[in-house]
Amino acid sequence: MFTIRAGYTDQVEIKASLENVIKFFSDIKNFVEMMPSIESIHTDGGGVTHWRIRVDVPFIGSFKEKFAVQLAEENEDRIEWIPAAGEKQNLLRYSAEFMPKSADSTVVQFSQNAELRRAAARELHPLAGLAGESIISGEMNKGIAQMVKSFVRKAKEKLEK
């Protein structure tokens, strides 16, 4: 089994009300508009949300992966997306926890994890076997960190206007 794992976790204080922060993070169009490498997100008739993400890896180049996720939790404390039932190859988990600091300030704890599983490296990309799991995982970690940091920066700017 050829497995690539990557993730990123961070915490940020946003000078906006809990209600506005939750509303922002509940709207998936904000992810498409503000998170780099997200090419599209759509929800099908069965309630499964499909994220299409571009992955750039040195020595290999760019490739696109689709992640099917479902909303596991959405309330005033937390939003969590988990892999859709039956998904075995492209696993994406995203969560945001909301902690009010004051009436006009909210702390948000982010976590995004991705896992790509293939029976053989060539199923992921013809050159994946040459790069190996650790190099690709390391580059994906950098990519996810960059995606989330950029998204959080843009979200903070928009919410604090």
Task: Kindly label every feature range from the protein language model.
Residues 3, 62-64, 132-146:
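Low-complexity, charge- and small-residue-enriched intrinsically disordered regions
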Residues 17-23, 139-147, 151:
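Short amphipathic alpha-helical segments
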Residues 18, 43-47, 72-77, 97-107:
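A short, structured loop/turn motif at beta-sheet edges
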Residues 84-142:
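Beta-strand/loop substructures that line and gate deep hydrophobic ligand-binding cavities in soluble
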Residues 1-50, 161:
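Hydrophobic ligand-binding cavity/cleft-lining segments
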Residues 5-11, 48, 66, 78, ...:
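Intrinsic-disorder/low-complexity, polar/charged segments enriched in Ser/Thr/Lys/Arg/Asp/Glu/Gln
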Residues 43-89, 146, 150-161:
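Glycine-rich portal/gate segments that line the openings of hydrophobic small-molecule binding cavities
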Residues 11-15, 42, 70, 97, ...:
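Generic structural detector for well-ordered beta-strands
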